[in-house]
Amino acid sequence: MSVAFPSAFGASRHLAALLSLWIGLSVVPPSAATPLPKQPTKHAKTGKHTGAQKMGAKGHKGQRAQPHASKATPTDGYASRPDAMQWADEAATRMDLPADWVRQQIGQARRIPLIEQLVLPAPSPVAKNWAAYRSRFIEPRRIEAGAAFWQRHQATLAKAEQAYGVPASIIVGIIGVETLFGQHMGNFRILDALATLAFDFPQAHPRARERQAFFQGELDHFLRMAQRSGNDAQSYRGSYAGAMGLPQFMPSSWSHYAVDFDGDGRIDLFNSPADAIGSVANYFKAFQWKAGMPTHYPVTVTPGQTDMDTLLAPDILPTFSVESFTSKGAQLQGPALQHNGLLALIELRNGEAAPSYVAGTENFYAVTRYNWSSYYAMAVIELGQAVAERMGR
């Protein structure tokens, strides 16, 4: 749900953002964003809508390193753009919102050319490298911050696990990978980011029409959310793709999956860790998380003996029973042989070194619904496990 694209392999911040867009991995690295200014503290509950989507590709809101908004030079507002103002009028009718209010918000939104550059695919292929990507997130600073977060909110995490069946380690892993437990939530104005991508999505992108329509839908959801909350729509800040709060929810995800988990009558993913924890758990439940099922198992594959083409063809979608999986030459041991469900062979490339492999379950696939990337999913899982070990669990 996130859409802050993490930089996977270094280089300059700007280049890193473009590269991570290509690999499709979703996260804000520790050094990539300045601390977020005070966010709106009151968010009214919104009705459910169709599921949120995340920007990116398989392997993936890749995310992408989050650049400094202060380095972005905005152009004039969209008030002078007839196409944007026409869209505002249509949106007001479509969403039953005050037309003058919608026109005012869109008119004050500013185009950010930097964002247009950041969503373009990398100009040349870069080798995916799980070991390098992993090292950005499974590291002492993030593990210590995760242990502190878990310690402070262990009652809420336990409550979420009981209510939704999602382990604390997965919730902690998500929030840790997305925003370093709220330390880096992004500092772009959400209206600027979404308007830029809704009205000026770069046509050089191979999926420009689809992506532009997606962001116009996100702008719809954001305007509805902001208007119902009573907060200043111009005050919301987040990633350059429009993701918000500790869990980096896109507006449609906020509309559909965010919950008031602290019981104060409002949903606040910026300032309420309880709401963030409950919302992440609710998201996974909605995407068919199965309580008690592991996310993956160790697997051994042997070149020349394992039918790699068949096993890798479905990508990360669990497709094979244990019997079918092992009949194709993939070796499982112990509990994996008793797994009651489907499996996928997950390949994690390591640059020029040999790839790593795991047998992903339906719960591994559920993690990729938060961000469509096997690399992202493994980072979330392993960060959560590392924090749990630090906690002595």
PLM region spans:
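Sec-dependent N-terminal signal peptides
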Residues: 2-34
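An acidic, Gly/Ser/Thr/Pro-rich helix-cap/linker signature
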Residues: 36-152, 158-161
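Glycine- and acidic
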Residues: 69-73, 261-265, 362-366
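Surface-exposed patches in mature extracellular/periplasmic domains of secreted proteins
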Residues: 97-106, 167-173, 233-238, 264-268, ...
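Acidic helix-start/capping segments at beta-turn-to-alpha-helix junctions
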Residues: 98-126, 175-179, 189-196, 298-306
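Acidic/His-rich structured neighborhood in mature extracellular/periplasmic domains
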Residues: 127-279, 285
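Ligand-binding pocket segment of bilobal, Venus flytrap-like solute-binding proteins
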Residues: 266-321
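C-terminal soluble interaction/assembly domains
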Residues: 301-393
